[in-house]
């Protein structure tokens, strides 16, 4: 029985099945997710006899930090190795990336939800990997727990988590939500929903499904284009879920009184960064309610795109504000340590394939 990734209810039921009191499941749940204790022998709230039995019948499988890359901006990028295992058939071994980003008042952890990705966004390094496999709930939660434990002596009061690493979270919906229920449970990892953000390329059925979850992370949309023609080229998923459908789903998505839907827009020099693009984005945002736009200048890598000029960034930002669209310019952390999602896994995999750029 693999314990990491199991809910409190699952642990309680399993312990009852072993003939133990259900509250032993609560103790294991607390040890895993609040105390970050991954050694059954050190779970001293459990009787010694039970610990010995669990040592024979249970496992706690953690990703292996194959590499750590330390950026001059203080962020740490992890390349985690995931072992093969059994879950509805054989799971392939894989590598995924997570980033720990400290700031003055908080730390933000960016995590992956799939190894590789099938969505095939043309500007994304992860697309070159293809989809290797979905991550389990335990593998997703571990990307939060391990950096928190490693940096426990210097943690700030607030932890933010963004599901913006490798993979499309809404194409691994059940495992992602199983992980999020643990992360957002006050008796689990204990993060507030307002501090956790799920980013999607625009999987409309997944957005509609997420909207029905009683406790859920905030929603972010990876927009990156100002019209369907442009988005079809940059993000082929748009051919299946065009902007009209995507924005309609966003309009219906429930948000709290202080909650925004975030639209992320990667600025690609000479591709989607013109003043007319900015005006079109402002029109797309009209009537959607509480939204904000994060402008993300392209992070240089091996793909055939270039950074936007500072003038283009400033003009795009200015036009959005002029049109009453809340907008922020966000520069990638860890740019000096292969910070684009997928770069580390690709480097480990070997030579990179060529990708057709948008001309």
For each of these PLM feature ranges, what is it?
Residues 1-96, 251-259, 265-359:
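Auxiliary Fe-S-binding modules of radical SAM enzymes
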Residues 100-101, 175:
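Residue-level structural signal for beta-strand termini and adjacent loop
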Residues 102-146:
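Canonical Radical SAM [4Fe-4S] cluster-binding loop centered on the CxxxCxxC motif
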Residues 70, 83-85, 101-103, 152, ...:
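Short polar/acidic secondary-structure junctions
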């Amino acid at each position: 029985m693999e314990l990491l990734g199991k809910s409190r209810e699952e642990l309680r039921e399993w312990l009852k099945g072993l003939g133990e009191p259900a509250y032993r499941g609560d103790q294991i749940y607390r040890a895993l997710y609040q105390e970050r204790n991954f050694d059954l022998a050190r779970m001293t709230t459990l009787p010694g006899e039970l610990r010995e039995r669990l040592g024979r019948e249970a496992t706690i499988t953690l990703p292996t930090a194959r590499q750590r890359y330390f950026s001059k901006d203080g962020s740490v990028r992890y390349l985690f190795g995931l072992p093969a295992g059994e879950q509805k058939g054989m799971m392939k071994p894989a590598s995924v990336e997570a980033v720990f980003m400290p700031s003055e008042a908080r730390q933000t952890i960016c995590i992956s939800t799939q190894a590789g990705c099938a969505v095939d966004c043309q500007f994304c390094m992860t697309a070159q990997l293809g989809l290797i496999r979905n991550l389990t709930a335990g593998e997703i939660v571990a990307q939060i727990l391990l950096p928190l434990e490693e940096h426990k002596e210097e943690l700030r009061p607030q932890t933010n988590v963004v599901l913006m690493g490798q993979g499309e979270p809404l194409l691994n919906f059940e495992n992602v939500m199983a992980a999020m229920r643990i992360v957002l449970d006050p008796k689990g990892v204990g993060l507030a929903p307002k501090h956790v953000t799920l980013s999607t390329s625009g999987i409309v059925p997944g957005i509609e499904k997420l909207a029905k979850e009683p406790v859920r992370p905030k929603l972010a949309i990876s927009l990156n284009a100002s019209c369907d023609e442009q988005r079809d080229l940059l993000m082929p998923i748009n051919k299946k879920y065009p902007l009209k459908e995507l924005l309609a789903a966003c309009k219906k998505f429930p948000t709290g009184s202080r909650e925004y839907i975030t639209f992320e827009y990667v600025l690609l020099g000479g591709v989607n960064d013109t003043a007319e693009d900015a005006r079109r984005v402002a029109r797309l945002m009209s009537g959607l309610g509480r939204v904000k736009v994060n402008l993300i200048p392209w992070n240089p890598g091996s793909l055939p795109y270039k950074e936007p000029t500072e003038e283009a960034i400033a003009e795009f930002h200015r036009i959005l504000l002029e049109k009453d669209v809340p907008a922020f310019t966000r520069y990638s952390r860890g740019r000096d340590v292969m910070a684009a999602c997928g770069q580390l896994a690709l480097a480990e995999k070997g030579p990179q394939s060529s990708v057709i750029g948008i001309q």
